[in-house]
Amino acid sequence: VLAYIAAQVCSVLKCDLILWFSDTGLEFPELKKHVKSFVEYLKRIYTGIHIELVIDYPKDKNGKRISFRDVILDVGYPIISKEVAQKVEFARSKPDGYCAEAFDPDSDYCKKYPKNCLKRWRGLLEAPFKISSKCCDIMKKKPAKAFEKMYCLKPILATMACESSLRRNDWLKNGCNAFDRGGRQRPISKPMSFWLEQDVLEFIHINNIPIATCYGDIVEKDGILTTTLYKRTGCMYCMFGVHRELQPNRFQILKDTHPAIWDYCMKPVEEGGLGLRDILEYIWVNSE
């Protein structure tokens, strides 16, 4: 949707449009295919502007491509939410810090900020595997910032405040266009921050915009627009928020739609897989 809107604006202003995509290896095969076909679709509609697709990859300091498996073995698994995963990681590294206090209901921190108390996830501190929120930073944000710096460009993102508490708080603090945040924070535009999922589906439906086949079709049920297959795609292996999903959850659906990928996800790390089965069992989530 954002690419479509940006192309409309660029068509009016007669300026070039650069669409940047990080091929992390976590995207659905249908989504990766759609990225290229959608750019060709935009070029057919907006013939008066130059539209360029840049496909990038997450790399280490030596230029070697980084995989999700590299990330989980190095820093840990992304589970529950970015906030919880980050606090678990910090609490483990500094047991006497405020992040550790967030898991103790009797601590001064939890008494002062009861809404921020994470006692429900206290058991994660003793989990027999690494936990981290750094996956998105490594796989998407770091290569994006490197691209921005190299070509002196500023990003326009399609993130929405309704997607997480962190994004909601960021929107409330900075608004849609945060060009003067100061410090080390880069200028950034998030014009869809106030959109809801229904707004996105309605915009696609009204403008007859093609979507990746993994979503299926957009249909109306009881006055609400929805997709017939996946509701969200994101990263196939990510476990953020899966504990809140009704069954069938994303991994149960993945087993039906992409069995080979599901097998790789669940296979133990020692056998070359990602070892997600044990992680999901630890947080009481069914994987099949």
What are these regions (language model features)?
Residues 184-185, 193-288:
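ATP/NTP-dependent adenylation/nucleotidyl-transfer catalytic domains that generate, transfer
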